[in-house]
Amino acid sequence: NNSSQRTILEKHEVDSIVINKYINEFWTSRQRQASSIHEISYRACFKPQLPRFFINLLSEPKDIVYDPFSGRGTTVIEASLLLRNIISNDINPLSEILTYPRFFIPKLTDIRKRLDSISILDTAKADIDLSMFYHPRTEAEIVSLKTYLMSRREAGEEDNLDKWIRMVATNRLTGHSRGFFSVYTLPPNQAVSPQQQVKINRRLGQKPEYRDTHAIIIKNSDILNIRMYSSTSSSSIFDISSKLSIK
């Protein structure tokens, strides 16, 4: 909590159980002080400062922090930064895709090498018409990457580097700036239908331009704090990674 106000503690009793209520401004719009590893687009996620306050207050290093509705993983990532062991759970498969890889941050050079090794079939297309979202070359790169990742998983050869690339690519599929693979649209968790996208394109007078997916993956990997660890080994930056449980 970076607020200048002191936290107010109120106690409420419900069925003879005393419940503490903490009142304060736990983050403000000017605060960008959390770790950049949290910079993942996800609908209705809260700022890391909120779980940090309660994790510091209610637990000690090496304690277990359990999040039954993990979402993009804000709570468990923040808990691990505070040297807690964590258990993460969420019915949405996106939760694991977006959370797990951030416990095993790879070198930027390794990401480049892996991306360079992936063959791109220029004629590759999705099973459905996505021309209203992607330039043909961009779509070919996305489909080729998907084919590579699926083949690695099916062969039992998928590693943490593959999972990192999948995480970043998933988070960059659609959005509202040139930092995404698509033309201007909404992010994956607010995705519109192809018919709606056609209307958006017509209204804005836009058409999909080529986006270099590999360059975008590299750039966003850098934003997610790769630079801090570029000179270190590609092992986990968290002491708790060997005990990670994502169910």
Where are these regions (language model features)?
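PRPP-dependent phosphoribosyltransferase catalytic core
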Residues: 109-153
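Hydrophobic (often cysteine-bearing) scaffold residues that line and stabilize catalytic clefts
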Residues: 43, 47, 95, 138, ...
